[in-house]
């Protein structure tokens, strides 16, 4: 993808990047390991964004 992007697309890509993080360690500890992963994790090669 080129480096020149419209602002709207850039904002959507940034949001998707922020959402694609693992569950924080303090949450895993707080829930005693019940919450280990979140199902909306996206791997860049498998699932493509509609951005």
Curated annotation (Swiss-Prot):
Alphabetic keyword roster: Ribonucleoprotein, Ribosomal protein
SUPFAM superfamilies: Ribosomal protein L39e (SSF48662)
GO biological process, alphabetically ordered: translation
InterPro entries per record: Ribosomal_eL39 (IPR000077), Ribosomal_eL39_CS (IPR020083), Ribosomal_eL39_dom_sf (IPR023626)
Molecular function, one GO term: structural constituent of ribosome
One cellular component (GO) term of this entry: cytosolic large ribosomal subunit
HAMAP family named among the record's database cross-references: Ribosomal_eL39
Similarity comment text for this entry: Belongs to the eukaryotic ribosomal protein eL39 family.
Protein's recorded name: Large ribosomal subunit protein eL39
Species annotation: Methanocaldococcus jannaschii (strain ATCC 43067 / DSM 2661 / JAL-1 / JCM 10045 / NBRC 100440)
Gene name tied to this protein: rpl39e
């Amino acid at each position: 993808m080129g480096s020149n992007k419209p602002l709207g697309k850039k904002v959507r890509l940034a949001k998707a990047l922020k959402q694609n993080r693992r569950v924080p360690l303090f949450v895993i500890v707080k829930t005693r390991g019940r919450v280990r992963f979140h199902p909306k994790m996206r791997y860049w090669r498998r699932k493509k964004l509609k951005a």
